Amino acid sequence: KDAKRTDTIILANFDPITKEAKLISIPRDTRVKIGGKSQKINAAYPIGGEKLVKQLVGNILGVKVDYVVKVDYEGFRGIIDAIGGIDMYIEQDMNYDDPGQDLHIHFNKGETVHLDGKKAEEFFRWRKNNDGTGLANGDVDRIKNQQKFINAVIDKVLSVSTITKIDSIAEILNK
Protein backbone atom coordinates (compact mmCIF):
# COMPACT_ATOMS: atom_id res chain seq x y z
CA LYS A 1 0.00 0.00 0.00
CA ASP A 2 1.38 3.41 -0.92
CA ALA A 3 2.19 5.71 1.96
CA LYS A 4 -0.02 8.77 2.00
CA ARG A 5 1.12 12.35 2.36
CA THR A 6 1.29 13.64 5.90
CA ASP A 7 -1.83 15.55 6.96
CA THR A 8 -0.37 17.37 9.97
CA ILE A 9 3.18 17.91 11.25
CA ILE A 10 3.70 19.18 14.80
CA LEU A 11 7.00 19.46 16.66
CA ALA A 12 6.67 18.99 20.41
CA ASN A 13 9.41 20.32 22.64
CA PHE A 14 9.53 19.46 26.34
CA ASP A 15 11.78 21.40 28.69
CA PRO A 16 12.59 19.11 31.64
CA ILE A 17 13.71 22.06 33.78
CA THR A 18 10.60 24.21 33.44
CA LYS A 19 8.38 21.16 32.78
CA GLU A 20 6.76 23.07 29.92
CA ALA A 21 5.81 21.62 26.57
CA LYS A 22 5.55 23.69 23.42
CA LEU A 23 3.97 22.62 20.15
CA ILE A 24 5.00 24.10 16.82
CA SER A 25 2.99 23.29 13.71
CA ILE A 26 4.68 23.06 10.32
CA PRO A 27 2.29 24.04 7.51
CA ARG A 28 1.82 21.02 5.23
CA ASP A 29 2.47 23.14 2.14
CA THR A 30 5.89 24.35 3.36
CA ARG A 31 8.30 24.02 0.43
CA VAL A 32 11.47 21.98 1.01
CA LYS A 33 14.13 20.38 -1.18
CA ILE A 34 13.71 16.63 -1.49
CA GLY A 35 16.10 14.90 -3.85
CA GLY A 36 17.07 18.25 -5.33
CA LYS A 37 13.45 19.14 -6.19
CA SER A 38 11.17 21.66 -4.49
CA GLN A 39 8.27 19.78 -2.91
CA LYS A 40 5.75 20.22 -0.12
CA ILE A 41 6.95 18.90 3.23
CA ASN A 42 3.91 16.63 3.48
CA ALA A 43 5.53 14.47 0.75
CA ALA A 44 8.58 13.76 2.94
CA TYR A 45 7.25 10.72 4.81
CA PRO A 46 6.18 8.67 1.76
CA ILE A 47 9.50 9.50 0.07
CA GLY A 48 12.00 9.09 2.91
CA GLY A 49 10.16 7.94 6.00
CA GLU A 50 10.79 9.13 9.53
CA LYS A 51 14.46 9.87 8.88
CA LEU A 52 13.67 12.43 6.16
CA VAL A 53 10.86 14.03 8.17
CA LYS A 54 13.17 14.45 11.19
CA GLN A 55 15.89 15.94 8.99
CA LEU A 56 13.61 18.42 7.21
CA VAL A 57 11.74 19.57 10.34
CA GLY A 58 15.07 19.91 12.15
CA ASN A 59 16.50 21.97 9.29
CA ILE A 60 13.47 24.29 9.18
CA LEU A 61 13.47 24.95 12.92
CA GLY A 62 17.18 24.65 13.64
CA VAL A 63 16.74 21.87 16.19
CA LYS A 64 17.56 18.19 16.54
CA VAL A 65 14.43 16.07 16.29
CA ASP A 66 14.82 13.03 18.54
CA TYR A 67 11.59 11.10 18.04
CA VAL A 68 8.67 10.75 15.65
CA VAL A 69 5.16 9.82 16.72
CA LYS A 70 2.83 8.74 13.93
CA VAL A 71 -0.90 8.69 14.46
CA ASP A 72 -3.16 7.55 11.64
CA TYR A 73 -6.83 8.50 11.44
CA GLU A 74 -7.93 5.28 13.12
CA GLY A 75 -5.59 5.90 16.05
CA PHE A 76 -6.65 9.55 16.25
CA ARG A 77 -10.33 8.55 16.44
CA GLY A 78 -9.50 5.91 19.04
CA ILE A 79 -7.65 8.35 21.29
CA ILE A 80 -10.49 10.88 21.19
CA ASP A 81 -13.08 8.18 21.87
CA ALA A 82 -10.96 6.83 24.76
CA ILE A 83 -10.99 10.22 26.50
CA GLY A 84 -14.72 10.62 25.97
CA GLY A 85 -14.61 13.18 23.16
CA ILE A 86 -13.99 16.92 23.13
CA ASP A 87 -16.34 19.91 23.18
CA MET A 88 -15.43 22.55 20.58
CA TYR A 89 -16.96 25.90 19.71
CA ILE A 90 -17.43 26.13 15.94
CA GLU A 91 -16.20 29.52 14.71
CA GLN A 92 -17.39 29.25 11.11
CA ASP A 93 -19.63 27.09 8.96
CA MET A 94 -17.91 23.90 7.85
CA ASN A 95 -19.54 22.06 4.95
CA TYR A 96 -17.37 19.73 2.93
CA ASP A 97 -17.94 16.36 1.29
CA ASP A 98 -15.37 14.01 -0.24
CA PRO A 99 -17.19 10.75 -1.06
CA GLY A 100 -13.91 9.18 -2.24
CA GLN A 101 -12.53 9.39 1.30
CA ASP A 102 -15.95 8.93 2.93
CA LEU A 103 -15.33 12.34 4.50
CA HIS A 104 -18.39 14.44 5.28
CA ILE A 105 -17.87 17.54 7.43
CA HIS A 106 -20.91 19.53 8.54
CA PHE A 107 -20.73 21.93 11.50
CA ASN A 108 -22.62 25.19 12.01
CA LYS A 109 -20.99 28.44 13.11
CA GLY A 110 -21.81 29.47 16.66
CA GLU A 111 -22.51 25.99 18.01
CA THR A 112 -20.59 24.12 20.67
CA VAL A 113 -20.36 20.54 19.46
CA HIS A 114 -19.32 17.40 21.31
CA LEU A 115 -16.83 15.67 19.02
CA ASP A 116 -16.40 11.92 19.23
CA GLY A 117 -13.46 10.39 17.36
CA LYS A 118 -15.08 10.56 13.92
CA LYS A 119 -16.40 14.11 14.34
CA ALA A 120 -13.03 15.19 15.80
CA GLU A 121 -11.28 13.87 12.69
CA GLU A 122 -13.67 15.88 10.54
CA PHE A 123 -13.02 19.06 12.54
CA PHE A 124 -9.25 18.49 12.49
CA ARG A 125 -9.10 17.87 8.73
CA TRP A 126 -11.41 20.67 7.51
CA ARG A 127 -9.84 23.27 5.21
CA LYS A 128 -12.57 24.51 2.90
CA ASN A 129 -16.23 24.19 2.03
CA ASN A 130 -17.79 22.56 -1.02
CA ASP A 131 -18.32 26.01 -2.57
CA GLY A 132 -14.63 26.91 -2.20
CA THR A 133 -15.10 29.26 0.75
CA GLY A 134 -13.24 28.54 3.92
CA LEU A 135 -10.31 29.78 5.90
CA ALA A 136 -8.92 33.13 4.76
CA ASN A 137 -5.33 32.04 5.35
CA GLY A 138 -5.71 28.40 4.29
CA ASP A 139 -3.51 25.95 6.15
CA VAL A 140 -2.26 28.61 8.59
CA ASP A 141 -5.83 29.12 9.88
CA ARG A 142 -6.39 25.35 9.82
CA ILE A 143 -3.37 25.04 12.11
CA LYS A 144 -4.99 27.54 14.52
CA ASN A 145 -8.11 25.34 14.66
CA GLN A 146 -5.94 22.28 15.23
CA GLN A 147 -4.01 23.99 18.03
CA LYS A 148 -7.26 24.97 19.79
CA PHE A 149 -8.37 21.36 19.48
CA ILE A 150 -5.03 19.99 20.78
CA ASN A 151 -5.18 22.37 23.76
CA ALA A 152 -8.68 21.10 24.56
CA VAL A 153 -7.40 17.50 24.33
CA ILE A 154 -4.45 18.28 26.64
CA ASP A 155 -6.76 19.95 29.17
CA LYS A 156 -9.05 16.93 29.11
CA VAL A 157 -6.22 14.39 29.35
CA LEU A 158 -4.84 16.22 32.39
CA SER A 159 -8.24 16.26 34.09
CA VAL A 160 -8.93 13.84 36.93
CA SER A 161 -11.79 12.15 35.05
CA THR A 162 -9.46 11.13 32.22
CA ILE A 163 -6.56 9.82 34.32
CA THR A 164 -8.45 6.54 34.78
CA LYS A 165 -8.46 6.05 30.99
CA ILE A 166 -4.67 6.25 30.54
CA ASP A 167 -4.33 2.47 30.02
CA SER A 168 -6.73 2.46 27.06
CA ILE A 169 -5.00 5.51 25.55
CA ALA A 170 -1.58 3.84 25.90
CA GLU A 171 -2.96 0.69 24.26
CA ILE A 172 -4.14 2.71 21.24
CA LEU A 173 -0.77 4.47 20.93
CA ASN A 174 1.07 1.13 20.96
CA LYS A 175 -0.80 -0.16 17.88
Q: What does each model-identified segment do?
A:
Residues 1-175:
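Non-catalytic, solvent-exposed segments at the cell envelope interface
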